[in-house]
């Protein structure tokens, strides 16, 4: 569906190793895994009435520097870039190529190959299995009621736009789990609830519209889906800014759990894909389809004050042996349909929350730190990384 979008969402994995990265060895690692990870070595082919992915046989180059080359203009039409500087490796990619869980196996594979070359390890580097795409038409037949207007509509809200400022929050994972256990809720619920407290104070709003993403691979029976396989929800919450977590944790947990039920997830996917299918079926030039899609996305979209995406352990499969070579891991994604975007990963017992903030007002890091500390969660860092 992202082919039709005017503005593509770019994601970043930022991996800090203990030692300086050797660009030549990183290039060798990328070349070695190429035959094992065909999905990622593709390009978009633009036809008169449609666009599709096709294999790309051009050279795929590792570059040096923190700044990503323009994708796909400066990457030989590849939809990702791999670059490094100092001790850090950067992966940048278009979200329509893969979501976070879809990209993690490739990132893990490249790191395994690099460590084998750099440190003489013997990590297995095996071909990544690929599940075929699901049929959205069958999904729509299963849930025809999902296409009724206003099925999941919230009151529209205004969101901030512009270049975001970056904020980083680091939390002790064990203390968050303890806070969740005290309330009898999921750790993600505790995380979301406390973020609602901090964001409510920062935005000075008594009612928030929060958003979160849910992975459908297990629900759809597609564990090896490399493509984008998530849904998003936008849900309201009142009174979090002036309340303790205990006052609303159970209700928040019930709402999140309800929306994570398999049937609800499939229904939501049908909702999201319905308009995409209708646009695809139009017998019109691609540029017209893009305009129709953008108009429909604007009219039917439900922007949120903020969204939270929890990746957890970033490596797939999980590998404590590989993690030993990694000092830090950060995930950055531009806010899409929200004023704030938070990506959370877990490594070495630390939750790292990378926040992109379009509000352009100082104080968010401090507001979140106060909210987490008040609920007994140990805050290891709360930093505004860009000048306000």
Q: Model segments located where?
A:
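Acyl activation and transfer enzymes in specialized metabolism, enriched
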Residues: 19-35, 92-108, 168-204, 353-355, ...
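Amphipathic alpha-helical scaffolding segments
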Residues: 108-111, 197, 210-213
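Histidine-centered acyl-transfer/condensation active-site motif
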Residues: 69-120, 124-136, 345-362, 372
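Acyl-thioester-dependent acyl-group transfer interface
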Residues: 1-49, 56-81, 200-388
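Non-catalytic, low-complexity flexible loops and terminal extensions
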Residues: 1, 97-179, 373-388
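Generic anion/oxyanion-binding catalytic loop in active/binding sites
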Residues: 15, 95, 165, 179-180, ...
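Short, charge-rich amphipathic segments
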Residues: 37-45, 119-134, 174-190, 294-310
């Amino acid at each position: 569906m992202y082919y039709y979008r005017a503005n593509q969402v770019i994601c970043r994995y930022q991996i800090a190793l203990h030692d300086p990265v050797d660009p030549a060895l990183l290039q060798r690692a990328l070349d070695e895994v190429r035959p094992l990870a065909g999905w990622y070595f593709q390009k978009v082919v633009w036809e008169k009435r449609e666009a599709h992915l096709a294999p790309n046989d051009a050279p795929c180059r590792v570059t040096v520097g923190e700044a990503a080359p323009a994708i796909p203009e400066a990457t030989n039409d590849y939809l990702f870039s791999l670059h490094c500087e100092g001790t850090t490796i950067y992966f940048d990619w278009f979200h329509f190529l893969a979501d976070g869980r879809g990209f993690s196996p490739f990132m893990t594979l490249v790191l395994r190959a690099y460590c084998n070359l750099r440190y003489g390890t013997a990590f297995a580097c095996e071909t990544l299995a690929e599940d075929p795409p699901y049929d959205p038409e069958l999904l729509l037949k299963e849930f025809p009621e999902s296409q009724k207007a206003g099925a999941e509509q919230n009151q529209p809200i205004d969101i901030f736009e512009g270049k975001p400022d970056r904020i980083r929050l680091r939390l002790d994972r064990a203390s968050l789990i303890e806070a969740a256990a005290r309330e009898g809720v999921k750790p993600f619920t505790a995380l979301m609830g406390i973020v609602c407290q901090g964001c409510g104070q920062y935005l000075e709003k008594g009612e928030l519209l929060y958003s979160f993403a849910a992975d459908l691979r297990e629900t759809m029976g597609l564990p090896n889906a490399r493509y984008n396989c998530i849904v998003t929800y936008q849900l309201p919450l009142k009174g979090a800014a002036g309340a303790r977590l205990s006052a609303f944790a159970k209700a928040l947990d019930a709402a999140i759990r309800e929306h994570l039920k398999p049937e609800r997830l499939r229904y939501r996917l049908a909702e999201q894909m319905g308009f995409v299918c209708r646009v695809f079926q139009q017998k019109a030039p691609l540029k017209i389809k893009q305009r129709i899609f953008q108009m429909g996305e604007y009219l039917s979209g439900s922007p949120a004050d903020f969204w939270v995406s929890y990746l957890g352990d970033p490596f797939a499969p999980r590998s404590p042996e590989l993690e030993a070579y990694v000092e830090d891991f950060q995930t950055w994604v531009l806010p899409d349909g929200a004023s704030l975007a938070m990506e959370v990963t877990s490594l070495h017992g630390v939750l790292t929350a990378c926040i992109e903030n379009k509000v352009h007002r100082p104080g968010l890091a401090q507001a979140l730190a106060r909210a987490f500390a008040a609920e007994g969660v140990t805050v290891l860092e709360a930093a505004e990384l860009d000048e306000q």
